[in-house]
Amino acid sequence: RKFYHPSNSFIYLYGNMDMAEKLDWLDREYLSHYDHQPVDSEIHYQKPFDAPKDREIFYPITEDEPEDHATYLSVNTVVGDDLDPILYMAFQILEYVLLDAPGAILKKELISAGIGQDILGSYENGILQPYFSVIAKNADGSQKEAFLKTVKATLKKLADDGINQKSLLAGINYYEFRSREADFGNAPKGLMYGLQCLDSWLYGGDPLMHLEYEETFAFLKKAAKEGYFEELIRKYLLDNPFEAVITVSPKRGLTAIEDEKLREKLEAYKKSLGAEEIQAIVDGTKELKEYQDTPSPKEDLEKIPLLKRSDIRKEAEKFILTEREIDGTKVLAHELFTSGIGYLRVMFRTDHVPSRDLPYVGLLKAVLGFVDTTKHTYSDLSDEINLNTGGITLSVSSYADSRKQGAFTGIFTASARVLCEK
């Protein structure tokens, strides 16, 4: 009645539709049945720290689990707010350049220093005050000072000497391609757009703020050459007291300690209750259990809308395909609307590979693109790929032969996404 009231909701419609008709239905079937209620849903800004905070948190491990190489080290910095579309995208690009891309400089420096067994980055931008995190996983508590020193020294060097321009432009192109393509995999596009709208809408901003990216990318491409990203590092990651260093350490016996605290708390609460209050809890628990175990009445189940056979389209989708041959190679082309993006797959049969060597085909797939070549380091190769494409991926698959039981055809596939103009 309070939290699930439509006055406390955000409603959006997505798709090609008669908007007036849908809004009329929404009002007639839902909104008109409620009176408007004032709702104070404003999320207030947290006051910045006067100086960085340092905290250690413990997590439980069993008696058999080792304490060595089981600590998580992180430095987390608040970055402006979520209502700046340029900052919102710029730090996604910085996360990619510093920590996510193959050969990313900050990750590389931390790994070279032997800190932790893996380095992670995170830019949490779905909240009013986003934060940027650098995390060393499976580290030791004794590495904390070296971790912080390496992070700050690397960031200072980048701020003073500049970030590799090719890496920056590759990161910008990577996110611009993702924005234009809007490929959310199996997730409905309308749902993902709606969630992205909430990144600003929940905090009083324009719902379309983070969907309108043309001006943002145009600015970032120009600003990348003018020291903009270096200034972001200096302002938000080096000279910013709104920072928390969090150490998460393992502790044996912690589960038993927490269980005992909970037992004592519940025991104290029980002693504060009268006999009638205790009985009310018992009765309420019994009623809840009965409700959960009782099947829903048939008439209620029939209220749930279901697809009818007549709702399913009878016509099969047309398979648009042309087949031709280029230099002795069969080429299959699909002429479809793809928002100006070309999708290319080059497929190689693996019939000629001896069966004993087939596992190495999988190994080849795993390392290609992540090792140095005769012309590029693996970091430079990643930049070249992201500057010129929307990504290149490799896969290995097998297809059963319907004409011969137990036979199959192995395929090694290289897939690329590129703007048609390229």
Predicted regions located by residue number:
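Extended, regular secondary-structure scaffolds
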Residues: 19-37, 161, 239-242, 251-288
